[in-house]
Curated annotation (Swiss-Prot):
Keywords: Hydrolase. Belongs to the UPF0173 family. This is UPF0173 metal-dependent hydrolase GWCH70_2696. Coiled coil: none annotated. GO terms for molecular function: hydrolase activity.
């Protein structure tokens, strides 16, 4: 399995012959190394309905005939746009042919802002536990620190955790360091920072808060082989 960071909260997983994207925000994402026309996706996993996470999902899904896995309300909304979806909800897991997906809690919002200045409610935000080839990845989505991260860490052997550190909209570095301790992940990668001025952070300062060897700053396009 190979896991690659592509800026902001975009993560690509390559496993079992499939290419899986989490939160493919590419157009308008100054932090990514990707070009939309070059992206191939078999599966798209979404944590919540904000534009900087749904991103280019509809276009990518239609172009690649990709399956979109998302919380129920968000999946329903995307299904109305002609996207092939699999709805899930927090606490639920499903075994697909490419791996197992389970949604966890996240403390955030999930409204989509339309061009005519309407906000569409798209259910609860989520984190994602993805397991394949005997490895488990946790993508926290956008979230503040919450105590059930201890439970997630106790019940799952997490190989890589992607945690937001940008503050303002999500955890900042200090809270994310506590999350890393509770989750017990072997590797922790900071995400959701420096895309916009309001979430400017130094990821190396975050890594310095973690035990030696745990934190890993990935530049867009850099990956980890598991």
């Amino acid at each position: 399995m190979k896991v690659t960071y592509h800026g902001h909260s975009v993560v690509k997983i390559e496993t079992n012959g499939k290419t899986i994207f989490i939160d493919p925000f590419i157009t308008g994402n100054g932090a990514t190394d990707l070009k939309l026309e070059d992206v191939k996706a078999d599966v798209i996993l979404l944590t919540h309905g904000h534009g900087d996470h749904v991103g280019d999902t509809v276009q990518l899904a239609k172009k690649n005939n990709a399956l979109v896995i998302a919380p129920f309300e968000l999946a329903t909304y995307l299904g109305w746009q002609g996207v092939n979806t699999h709805p899930m909800h927090i606490g639920g897991a499903h075994q697909f042919d490419f791996g197992k997906v389970k949604l966890t809690q996240a403390f955030h919002g999930s409204g989509y802002v339309t061009e005519d200045k309407q906000i569409i409610y798209l259910g609860m935000p989520a984190g994602i536990l993805f397991t394949a080839e005997g490895k488990t990845i946790y993508h926290a989505g956008d979230t503040g620190l919450f105590s059930d991260m201890k439970l997630i860490g106790e019940r799952n052997s997490i190989d890589v955790a992607f945690l937001p550190i940008g503050d303002n909209f999500t955890m900042g570095p200090e809270d994310a360091a506590v999350a890393a301790e509770w989750l017990r992940a072997k590797i922790v990668v900071p995400i959701h920072y420096n895309t916009f001025p309001v979430i400017a952070q130094d990821p190396h300062q975050f890594v310095a808060l973690l035990p030696d060897g745990v934190g890993r700053v990935l530049k867009p396009g850099e990956g980890i082989e598991l």
